[in-house]
Amino acid sequence: MSKDLITGAEAMMRSLEHQGVTTIFGYPGGSIMPTFDALYDHQNTLNHILVRHEQGAAHAAQGYARVSGKVGVCLVTSGPGATNTITGIADAMIDSTPIVVIAGQVGTGFLGTDAFQEVDLVGITQPIAKWSYQIRRAEDVAWAIARAFYIASSGRPGPVVLDFAKNAQVEKTKYEPTQQEFIRSYVPVPDTDEESVKAAAELINNAERPLVLVGQGVELGSAQEELRIFIEKADMPAGCTLLGLSALPTDHPLNKGMLGMHGNLGPNINTNKCRLLIAVGMRFDDRVTGNLATYAKQAKVIHFDIDPAEVNKNVKVDIAVLGDCKKTLAAVTGLLKKNRHTEWVDSFKEYEAVEEEKVIRPELHPATDSLSMGEVVRAVSEATRHEAILVTDVGQNQMISARYFKYTRERSIVTSGGLGTMGFGLPAAIGATFGRPDRTVCVFMGDGGLQMNIQELGTIMEQKAPVKIICLNNNYLGNVRQWQAMFFNHRYSFTPMLNPDYMKIASAYDIPSKRVFSREELKVAIDEMLSTDGPFLLEACVVEEGNVLPMTPPGGSVNQMLLEC
């Protein structure tokens, strides 16, 4: 009988394998050592990526999940190891990213005694995770993992935290594979009301000036094709949120660009001119709506979403179509008449012309010798034939990349949208290379964000991860400086940056690099970067006080976008 028993740590490994896990991002330590010992015997099936900081593990798991559609996994120890993942957990929660964080914990006999590296991880993470649970017995491992993966990946995805007591790791138990399929108190996908489907279709069929707002929910629901058919049948222009940018190809004739504070003029201004606003898998966050008191007050609103909590949270809706958007979009489309809104669609051209003249042309073809941020981004996008996965950090690099990178394929943008986490980019890009090893991964970073998790260059070196790092170096914390210039009378309070030599740092990690100042150097360096097997760091020295435009001022309406500073 004893031969049939295995440790809780071994049960953890088998449970992860049963869930189809192949990649784990982690960092060992005292309270999780029995599990890492079990992992030693599973290296042929479970590829463990040793990060250099636990925050890096959480963000790498996010990057992996976002590009692959699978659940990302990270494995860390208790105390500081666990708390170092908190930012990644919060980031995953607000951006609906499915990850499972497994952290060691002191033995149950030591709980509540302030033991070495004891921290109440369940208590800390309950507000920022879909489910937090402490595994106290080895016999609970299999069902806890099954439930964790089910909750993380079903409905609106998100992070799950498992606090794995040390005694549960070493206790013996009988293992039986478990697959969670139902939890009575948890309804991940609400039932779709047929009446709401009919009402939505009727409103769309009779609408003048409809506008579709495309969110990340389209990609989370693998509904890109359903979205395309939906907008084409009714001839409806669309704008995409930051996280929804690759849900619709950039060059689709009905894709009118990005929504939000630094988005395109057309979809932003016409939000306040449309007669019907159709939100699909987006949550009306403040960066998209601007001043809610003036947002789309003239329009009827239809909201497609899988999460009932998002309906009427920020914007009052007339019709809520709840459920999986892949199914709900198809259901509504089946009731739509073929329509034409030629005059309405053409009205976007006026704003496109203004933006081209006032913003895009000066950014992509600057009059000065200095490189602009936008021309670097567009050059990389064109060199990859617009097929690369774009990962960004946070700051000006994020907004400029989102504006000037083009998207032709699904799941092609990975960025920290809701939490805005500087330091996200580098580890997320590592995760993306493991999630989609068949695709080129380019990460754009500022000189500020690059230094926040720069230790992950060690992970890139060890794994030979083919991350193409583009540092837009302007010697400033650029986004904060832009706000200081626009709203704080150019008082640059602690935003100028004295930077290290990034090429020397890259060399220390045995990563090829290039620093460029001119357009001629940029083209040569991009070609070298993309032809290099493995990682590469391209430092583009851009104009120091460049700004990301247009911009909705804080507290302003979406139709009050600024075209100059």
Question: How does the language model describe each region?
Answer:
Residues K166-Q169, N397, E544:
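Short, internal active-site loops enriched in acidic
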Residues I102, L111-Q117, N268, N312-N314, ...:
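Thiamine diphosphate
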Residues Y27-G29, H48-H59, C74-G81, R136-A138, ...:
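Active-site nucleophile and cofactor-binding loops and adjacent substrate-binding regions
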Residues G215-E219, H365, G446:
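Conserved short loop/turn motifs at secondary-structure junctions
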Residues S2-E343, A383-H386, P466-I469, A506:
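N-terminal alpha/beta PP-like core and its mobile active-site loop of ThDP/TPP-dependent enzymes
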Residues M1-K3, E139, Y175, K198, ...:
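Phosphate/pyrophosphate-binding active-site segments
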Residues A9-T22, G30, T35-Y40, E352-P427, ...:
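Active-site diphosphate/adenylate-binding microenvironment
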Residues V161, H303, V391, F444-M445:
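Generic enzyme active-site microenvironment
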